[in-house]
């Protein structure tokens, strides 16, 4: 799945996010800071799996910062590349995602990561 070696809860979402990465539209991602750094550090490379858990791309982390959900910038929302790329759409989509994951608060902390595509597998 996108950035996660575990079986994706939503294979279609994993495939959608991967397609955005491969098109060059998605160059950032974020996750609940309570999940830790997941081994990420600037300069590290990681493999992206598709919804069937097949390795499809290698990415390199170029920036990583901790940020509150309600302080995520319009620039970061644009870099995530999802929906219409607006901050409003980003907030709505990610609020729904985190609520579905069992935890959401406007002031929750996120790890916000920017990456570059190194290789297509």
Residue ranges of model-derived segments:
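Mixed-charge, low-complexity intrinsically disordered regions
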Residues: 1-60, 64-121
């Amino acid at each position: 799945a996108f950035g996660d070696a575990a079986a994706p809860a939503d294979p279609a979402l994993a495939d959608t996010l991967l397609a955005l990465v491969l098109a060059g539209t998605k160059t950032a991602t974020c996750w609940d800071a309570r999940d830790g750094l997941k081994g990420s550090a600037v300069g590290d490379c990681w493999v992206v799996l598709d919804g069937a858990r097949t390795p499809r791309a290698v990415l390199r982390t170029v920036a990583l910062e901790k940020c509150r959900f309600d302080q995520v910038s319009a620039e970061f929302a644009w870099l995530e590349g999802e929906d219409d790329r607006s901050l409003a759409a980003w907030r709505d989509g990610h609020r729904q995602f985190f609520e579905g994951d069992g935890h959401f608060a406007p002031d929750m902390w996120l790890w916000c990561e920017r990456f570059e595509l190194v290789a297509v597998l």
